[in-house]
From Swiss-Prot:
Record-level Gene Ontology MF annotations: GTP binding; GTPase activity; translation initiation factor activity
Spans annotated as G3: 503-506
Record localization: Cytoplasm
InterPro entries listed in its UniProt record: EF-G-like_DII, IF2_II, IF2_N, P-loop_NTPase, Small_GTP-bd, T_Tr_GTP-bd_dom, TF_IF2_bacterial-like, TIF_IF2
Function: One of the essential components for the initiation of protein synthesis. Protects formylmethionyl-tRNA from spontaneous hydrolysis and promotes its binding to the 30S ribosomal subunits. Also involved in the hydrolysis of GTP during the formation of the 70S ribosomal complex.
Gene designation: infB
NCBIfam families: IF-2, small_GTP
Protein name: Translation initiation factor IF-2
Record key words, sorted: Cytoplasm, GTP-binding, Initiation factor, Nucleotide-binding, Protein biosynthesis
Region feature (G4): 557-560
Residue spans of biased composition, Low complexity class: 174-190
Taxonomy, superkingdom: Bacteria
Domain tr-type G: 448-617
C-alpha cells in the first residue's frame, strides 16, 4: 500500500485546487474509476487518469482488472520510455494490433470495440466546442491561418513518424524478459515524471502571464481507408525518429514566411471565422480548452488518427491596435467629409455679423451709400437693405440708444434721423402713399383753380359765425353750445370767383383736425377776438400754418364791441413775429364783425388778391386725388366722407380707395345739398359708396376698377396691421421700467362712439392725456356710429367700465341691456363736458394727497410704570397743544423710535382732552411702554386732499 497515490495529493500535483476535486472525480468516472475524496489509487490508475485529464487519452479501467501479460507490459513501458508525452491524444485501436500478430484483423476490431467502447465517428464530421474563451495562448508570433495544403503536408510527415515507431516496437520485443521485473517500478517512475512535467508546465504558464494566450484547435478526422492502409504498411527503418516539435517548428517557419507575403499584398488581415455551433451530438469535437506550449513536445502519436492544430492567428492580435487606429482615423475622415457640405459651410448669425463688420470697415469690399431715399414708414430690415448696412449693426445701434426692436418693427422719423447720423448717411424721407398712388397725367393743361382757405383760431373767437355771415347762413346755431365739433367745408362765390372754406374747431382737443386743415389749405385765416387777444389755440394755429408754409391773413373779429384795442392785438402778434403791413410787415390785419358783417367784403377781396399772387393751378384731366376731411356713418346712406379734390376729376361711378376703405362713388352732394356729377380741383363734396369710414386726413385715390381698389385697400390694411403689431412689441428701456413700476396701476376700460371720425380721434387723444401714474384710461374699442349690444358685451365683465357717446343716443334695447350688464353709458354733445366728466371719474379712483399739520410738542421729564396699565410719561408741553387721540411720534436723540396714537392724556389725576403750552401732563401711548426720560413727543394731524389733473 506504500505505492498507492493519494487523490488529494494527485489533484495538488496536477496544479488544481481542492474545489476542482469534484471535477477530477467526475473525470475518473468517465474511464471507469470510482473514487471518493479520501481514496487512494494505484500508480497504474493514477497514470491513466493523468493521461485522460492532461492528454485526453481515454483508457477504460475494469472493475476487476486481470493480471497483465508481462510481455505486453514490457512493450507498453518501452513505448512510454521511447516516445515523449504528446500534448493531445485520443484512445486508439493500434496497441491491440501489436499484441498478437497471428490473430486475424476482424477479431482485433471486435476486441478493440469491447475494451474501449466509444461513440461511432462518422466520416468527416466535426464539432467545435469553445470551453476556454477567456484564456490566451502562451505562444507568441504564431501565424494566422492554416490552409488545407499545409495540413496535408503535416499528415504525410506524421505518417512517416508512425511507420518508424512501429518498426521500433518490433525491435523492443526481444528485450521483454529483462524489463518484466521492473514493470511496476517503471510505471511509478513514469507517473512521477509526468507529474514533474505538469509542474514544469505550470511554471512555464506563470512565466508567460503577460503574453496573450491562444486557443488551440483539435481537428479529428476519421477515415477507415487510411486506417487499413496504416495497419498493413509496417516497415522497418533504422533511421532515427524525428520529434514532432522539430517538425512543427519547420512548418511554423514556412507558414510565417507565407503569411508575411500575404500581409504585404493585402492591407486588411483576414479575420478568423466564427466558431460554428454544435448541432449534433454524434459529430466529433474540436476542443478549445487545451492551452499548451508545443515546443519540446511531440504532438502526434502513431496510435491515434487525430491531428492537433494550434490557432496561428497571432498576427491578427499584433495588428489589432493598428486596426483600431486606422478605424478611428477612417471615422474622423468621414466626419470631416460630412462637415464639408453646403449646409455646414454656412456660418452662424454671430459669425456672419462679425465678418460683415470687417467688410463694412473695408471700403473695397462694402460701400455704404451716401444718399438714400427712405420711406416715411419703414421696417428695420428695409432700412438696412436700402442703406446697404448690416441688420445686426442697425439693431445694435438702436439697442445702445435704449430701443429694443426686431427686424420687422417700424422706425419713426426720429429713429431714422438718429441712424442716419450714426452711419453718416444723407437720407430723404418719402411719403408712404406714393407706392399706392397713380401717376399723375403729365400731359395736360393746368387750369386755374379756386383757393382753399382754412379758418383757424381760438375757441369762441367767432370763426363759425364769421363763416356763417360769409355764406349768409347761420350754421353756428345748429352746433351744440355754439361750438364747432368737426370740420365743415363750404364753397363761396365772390366776384364770379369761387373760394373753398374749411372751418376747423378751435378747442384744444381738435389739434390734429387743425393740422389736417392747414396741410390741405392754400391760405390760412387766423380769427382773433379783439377783446380777448392772442390765446393758446391761436398760437397753435399759427404754428400749424407756419409748418404748412402757407400765407396767413389775420381777421380781427368782434370789432363791433366797445372798448376794443386793435393796436394791442397787433402788438401781441408782432411779438410772435407776425408784423402788420401798416407797421412795415408782411401780414394783413383785417378788422371784421361777424355780428354786423362789417369788413367781410374786404376780407374776401384780400383772399382773392393773395390767390392771384400765388397763381394756383391744377390739372383737371386724369384720375382724382382728394383728401378726406371728415368721415361718418349716416342712417340710410352708410359710410360717408367729406372730400376736397387736389388734382384730377372725381365723377360718379369712379372706383377709389382711401387707406383701408374702398368702393365706387354712388352719389356726390355739395355744401348746399345739391347732387353733382363731377368734382374738380379745390371743390368740396360729400360722397357715398364706401366700404367703411375712412380715417380723417387720408388720401383718396381714383383707380380703374374695383379689383384694383380692393387689392390696394387690403394691402394697406395688412401694412397698418403689421405696424400696429410692431408698436405693441417695440419697447424702450424707460417704458419697460415704467411697466414694471406700474404693476398696480388702475385701468378704466372705455368704449368711445362718436358721430364723425375727426371727433372720435380728438376725444381719444384728450382722454389719453388724462392718464397718470396711478390711474389710466384704456380705450378697448372706438368707432363711428351708434352704441350696439356688441359694445356692451365687450365691457360686461370689466369693473369701472364706461361707454362714452358723443353726439349719439342709445336705443331702448341698448339701455335695457346696459342695466342688465350693469354698464354705465354716458352721452355728451359738448367735448368740454365729456373731458371734465372723465377727469372727475379718474380723481375719484385716485388716492388723496395726505399732508401733515404739526400741532404740538412735549418733553418727557419722568416715567411711571404702573402694573397692568403700562408706562406713563410725565411731560411738559413745549410747543403748541397736545390732544388726546391724536397721532404722535416718539423721538429719541433725533431719531423716531415709535409712531402711534396717544391713548391717555391726564392733567394730574383728571383725564383731559388737550393740554396747552407750558403745562405739565401725563401721556400714555397705545401698545408701547419703552419710554425714557429725555424723549420728545411730536403730535400731528393728517389732512387728506384730492388730487388734480
Amino acid at each position: 500500500m506504500s505505492d498507492m497515490v493519494d487523490l488529494k495529493k494527485f489533484v495538488t500535483e496536477l496544479g488544481k485546487t481542492q474545489k476542482e476535486l469534484k471535477n477530477v472525480i467526475e473525470q475518473a468516472k468517465d474511464i471507469g474509476l470510482e473514487l471518493k475524496t479520501n481514496f487512494k489509487m494505484t500508480p497504474e490508475q493514477a497514470g491513466k487518469l493523468y493521461k485522460y485529464i492532461v492528454d485526453g487519452i481515454k483508457e477504460q479501467i475494469q472493475a476487476n482488472q486481470p493480471t497483465k501479460n508481462p510481455k505486453q507490459d514490457n512493450k507498453d513501458d518501452l513505448n512510454t520510455a521511447a516516445t515523449p508525452k504528446p500534448l493531445a491524444k485520443k484512445a486508439s485501436k493500434t496497441p491491440k494490433k501489436e499484441e498478437t500478430k497471428a490473430q486475424p484483423k476482424p477479431k482485433k476490431t471486435k476486441e478493440k470495440k469491447k475494451e474501449a467502447p466509444a461513440p461511432i465517428i462518422k466520416k468527416k464530421e466535426i464539432e467545435i466546442v469553445n470551453t476556454f474563451e477567456n484564456q490566451t495562448p502562451l505562444v507568441e508570433n504564431t501565424p494566422k491561418a492554416v490552409s488545407h495544403s499545409q495540413i496535408e503536408k503535416a499528415k504525410q510527415k506524421l505518417q512517416e513518424i508512425q511507420k518508424s515507431r512501429e518498426a521500433l516496437n518490433k525491435l523492443t520485443q526481444s528485450n521483454t524478459n529483462t524489463t518484466n521485473n521492473a514493470n511496476s517500478a517503471s510505471n511509478v517512475s513514469n507517473a512521477k515524471k509526468e507529474i514533474s512535467e505538469v509542474k514544469k508546465q505550470e511554471q512555464e504558464i506563470k512565466r508567460h502571464e503577460n503574453i496573450k494566450r491562444r486557443t488551440g484547435f483539435r481537428v479529428i478526422k476519421r477515415n477507415d481507408e487510411t486506417e487499413n492502409e496504416t495497419e498493413n504498411s509496417v516497415t522497418e527503418s533504422k533511421k532515427p525518429t524525428q520529434s514532432a516539435a522539430a517538425i512543427f517548428e519547420d512548418i511554423k517557419k514556412e507558414w510565417q514566411e507565407k503569411d508575411k507575403q500575404e500581409t504585404k499584398k493585402t492591407k486588411k488581415p483576414s479575420k478568423p471565422k466564427a466558431t460554428p455551433t454544435a448541432k449534433n451530438n454524434k459529430s466529433h469535437k474540436i476542443d478549445f480548452s487545451d492551452v499548451r506550449d508545443f515546443k519540446g513536445n511531440d504532438i502526434y502519436d502513431d496510435e491515434t488518427d487525430e491531428i492537433l492544430l494550434f490557432d496561428l492567428h497571432e498576427q491578427d492580435n499584433l495588428n489589432k491596435e493598428e486596426e483600431e487606429k486606422e478605424a478611428r482615423q477612417n471615422i474622423n475622415d468621414r466626419v470631416r467629409v460630412q462637415r464639408k457640405n453646403p449646409w455646414m459651410n454656412e456660418a452662424g448669425i454671430k459669425r456672419q455679423s462679425k465678418k460683415k463688420r470687417v467688410f463694412r470697415n473695408d471700403n473695397s469690399q462694402k460701400v455704404i451709400q451716401s444718399a438714400i431715399a427712405i420711406p416715411e414708414e419703414v421696417r428695420v430690415y428695409e432700412f438696412a437693405q436700402k442703406a446697404n448696412l448690416n441688420l445686426a449693426d442697425v439693431i445694435k445701434t438702436l439697442f445702445n440708444l435704449g430701443l429694443m426692436v426686431t427686424k420687422n418693427d417700424f422706425l419713426d422719423k426720429d429713429s431714422i434721423e438718429i441712424l442716419a447720423e450714426e452711419f453718416h448717411l444723407e437720407i430723404s424721407v418719402q411719403n408712404t402713399l406714393e407706392e399706392f398712388e397713380v401717376e399723375e397725367v403729365l400731359e395736360g393743361v393746368k387750369k386755374e383753380r379756386p383757393p382753399v382757405v382754412t379758418i383757424m383760431g381760438h375757441v369762441d373767437h367767432g370763426k363759425t359765425s364769421l363763416l356763417d355771415k360769409i355764406r349768409d347762413k347761420r350754421v353756428a346755431h345748429t352746433e351744440a353750445g355754439g361750438i364747432t365739433q368737426h370740420i365743415g367745408a363750404y364753397m363761396v362765390e365772390k366776384n364770379n370767383k369761387w373760394v373753398s372754406f374749411i372751418d376747423t374747431p378751435g378747442h384744444e382737443a381738435f389739434s390734429q383736425m387743425r393740422n389736417r386743415g392747414a396741410q390741405v389749405t392754400d391760405i390760412a385765416v387766423i380769427v382773433i377776438a379783439a377783446d380777448d387777444g392772442v390765446k393758446q389755440q391761436t398760437i397753435e394755429a399759427l404754428e400749424h400754418a407756419k409748418a404748412a408754409n402757407v400765407p396767413v391773413i389775420f381777421a380781427m373779429n368782434k370789432m363791433d364791441k366797445p372798448n376794443v384795442n386793435p393796436d394791442k392785438l397787433k402788438a401781441e402778434c408782432a411779438e410772435l413775429g407776425y408784423n402788420p403791413v401798416d407797421w412795415g410787415g408782411e401780414h394783413e390785419f383785417i378788422p371784421v364783425s361777424a355780428k354786423t358783417g362789417d369788413g367781410i367784403d374786404n376780407l374776401l377781396e384780400t383772399i382773392l388778391i393773395q390767390a392771384d399772387i400765388m397763381e394756383l393751378k391744377a390739372i383737371e384731366e386724369g384720375s382724382a386725388r382728394a383728401v378726406v376731411l371728415e368721415g361718418s356713418v349716416e342712417k340710410g346712406r352708410g359710410a360717408v366722407a367729406t372730400v376736397i379734390v387736389q388734382s384730377g376729376t372725381l365723377s360718379v361711378g369712379d372706383s377709389f380707395f382711401a387707406e383701408t376703405a374702398f368702393g365706387k362713388v354712388r352719389t356726390m352732394t355739395d355744401d348746399q345739398g345739391k347732387s353733382i356729377q363731377n368734382l374738380k380741383p379745390s371743390m368740396v363734396a360729400l360722397i357715398t359708396g364706401l366700404s367703411e369710414v375712412p380715417p380723417a386726413g387720408s388720401v383718396l385715390i381714383g383707380v380703374e376698377n374695383d379689383s384694383i381698389a380692393r387689392l390696394q385697400a387690403q394691402k394697406r390694411a395688412t401694412y397698418l396691421r403689421q405696424k400696429a403689431l410692431s408698436k405693441s412689441t417695440k419697447v424702450s428701456f424707460d417704458e419697460l421700467s415704467e411697466m414694471v413700476a406700474n404693476k398696480e396701476l388702475k385701468n378704466i376700460p372705455v368704449i368711445i362712439k362718436a358721430d364723425t371720425q375727426g371727433s372720435l380721434e380728438a376725444i381719444k387723444n384728450s382722454l389719453l392725456e388724462l392718464n397718470n401714474e396711478e390711474v389710466a384710461i384704456q380705450v378697448i374699442h372706438s368707432g363711428v356710429g351708434g352704441i350696439t349690444e356688441n359694445d356692451l358685451s365687450l365691457v360686461s365683465s370689466s369693473e369701472h367700465a364706461v361707454i362714452l357717446g358723443f353726439n349719439i343716443r342709445p336705443t331702448g334695447n341698448v339701455k335695457n341691456k346696459a342695466k342688465e350688464y350693469n354698464v354705465s353709458i354716458k352721452t355728451y354733445t359738448v367735448i368740454y363736458a365729456l373731458i371734465e366728466g372723465m377727469r372727475s371719474l379718474l380723481l375719484g379712483l385716485m388716492s388723496p394727497i395726505i399732508e401733515e399739520e404739526h400741532t404740538g410738542q412735549a418733553e418727557v421729564r419722568e416715567t411711571f410704570n404702573i402694573p397692568k396699565v403700562g408706562t406713563i410719561a410725565g411731560c411738559v408741553v413745549s410747543d403748541g397743544e397736545i390732544a388726546r387721540g391724536i397721532k404722535a411720534r416718539l423721538i429719541r436723540d433725533g431719531v423716531v423710535v415709535h409712531t402711534g396714537e396717544i391713548l391717555s392724556l391726564k392733567r394730574f389725576k383728571d383725564d383731559v382732552k388737550e393740554v396747552s403750552k407750558g403745562y405739565e401732563c401725563g401721556i400714555m401711548l397705545d401698545n408701547y411702554n419703552e419710554i425714557k426720560v429725555g424723549d420728545v413727543f411730536e403730535t400731528y394731524k393728517e389732512i387728506h386732499k384730492k388730487r388734480t389733473l
